[in-house]
Amino acid sequence: MDSVDRLKTYLATYDNLDSALQDANESEERREDKYLQDLFIEDQGDKPTPSYYQEEESSDSDTDYNAEHLTMLSPDERIDKWEEDLPELEKIDDDIPVTFSDWTQPVMKENGGEKSLSLFPPVGLTKIQTEQWKKTIEAVCESSKYWNLSECQILNLEDSLTLKGRLMTPDCSSSVKSQNSVRRSEPLYSSHSPGPPLKVSESINLWDLKSTEVQLISKRAGVKDMTVKLTDFFGSEEEYYSVCPEGAPDLMGAIIMGLKYKKLFNQARMKYRL
């Protein structure tokens, strides 16, 4: 009897044959599972790690957040610890410098004895911002009616520019008496002639001198003398007394009153001896 026949005879008389076959099958299954698992690991090792996985892994390593440590803390302590460990990059920075590279500086032009000043808003403003810019310029120009802008002090504050100056009010009762002469015997009066100023008595109506010319003497090079009269500022006697019911101390005082009434006093006193 050959060996195969002997094996069959032995197996036929083996009491634990079923159990042995089951153990053999389970052993074979475990061997195949281990083989497939080892094969999968080897295949994964040959493939490069995806870029998104690398970025996520590196970003986690950049933070000080320690999940293992936080699990040991109370809920309140976890919140405090988490706030302490927030990355600096998450903080919002509002201090962003803004520059207008295409901004055009103001341009002063002169044509035929007239001057013009062109102002240009910064490029890139919205429609609302442009309107706000225009209203700011208009407000500055409007303020020149009440003071001399050239005499104002500019305060450069942290959040604004502030102009400070002496307010000019057209108060007729406080008109400054002229120290310059006005001579009645001459048809032309000067604001810079020697002698005491002409005092007007109660019987003399200053408006009777409405057509009398008064010469304003220039005090700046390049500015010519100018002659003015009351009718340059007032259209009628009623208008004259409606502006200043108390009248003026002299003819030059009335001229100064007219300059203030027309909002020209600040400009005139910069150019002429009043």
Curated annotation (Swiss-Prot):
Residue ranges, compositional bias (Acidic residues) = 54-65
Oligomerization: region residues: 104-165
Q: Where is the composition biased (Polar residues)?
A: 171-193
Modified sites of kind Phosphotyrosine: Y14
PTM sites of type Phosphoserine = S59, S61, S236, S242
> Can you tell which superkingdom this protein's organism belongs to?
Viruses
Instruction: Please describe, based on the UniProt annotation, the reported consequence of changing K262A.
Output: No effect on the binding of P to N-RNA. Loss of in vitro transcription and binding to L but no effect on RNA replication or on binding to soluble N
In its UniProt entry, what is this protein called?
Answer: Phosphoprotein
As for family, the record states:
Belongs to the vesiculovirus protein P family.
Q: How does it assemble?
A: Homodimer. Interacts with the L polymerase; the association of P and L forms the polymerase complex and positions P optimally for encapsidation of newly synthesized genomes with the nucleoprotein. Interacts (via N-terminus) with N(0). Interacts (via C-terminus) with N in ribonucleocapsid (via C-terminus); this interaction allows to package the L polymerase in the virion and positions the polymerase on the template, since P acts as a bridge between N and L.
Give the region (Interaction with N(0)) as residue ranges: 1-59
The listed locations are: Virion; Host cytoplasm
What organism does the record attribute this protein to? Vesicular stomatitis New Jersey virus (strain Ogden subtype Concan) (VSNJV)
Q: Know anything about its domains from the record?
A: The N-terminus is disordered and is involved in binding N(0). The region of interaction with the L polymerase is necessary for transcription. The hinge region is highly variable. The central domain is involved in oligomerization. The C-terminus is basic and essential for binding the N-RNA template.
The protein's site described by Involved in oligomerization is found at W133, T136
The protein's GO terms of the molecular function aspect are:
RNA-directed RNA polymerase activity
Keyword set for this entry? Chaperone, Host cytoplasm, Phosphoprotein, Viral RNA replication, Virion
> Does the record bear Ion transport in its keywords?
no
Chief location category: virion
Role according to the record = Nonenzymatic cofactor regulating the function and conformation of the RNA polymerase and part of the transcription and replication complex. Binds the viral ribonucleocapsid and positions the L polymerase on the template. Acts as a chaperone for newly synthesized free N protein, so-called N(0). Plays a role in virion assembly.
Q: Where is this region: Interaction with the L polymerase?
A: 49-101
- Residues of the region (Hinge) are 166-202
Region (Disordered), start-end ranges:
22-65, 170-196
State the post-translational modifications: Phosphorylated in the N-terminus by host CK2. Phosphorylation of the phosphoprotein is required for the transcriptional function of the P-L complex.
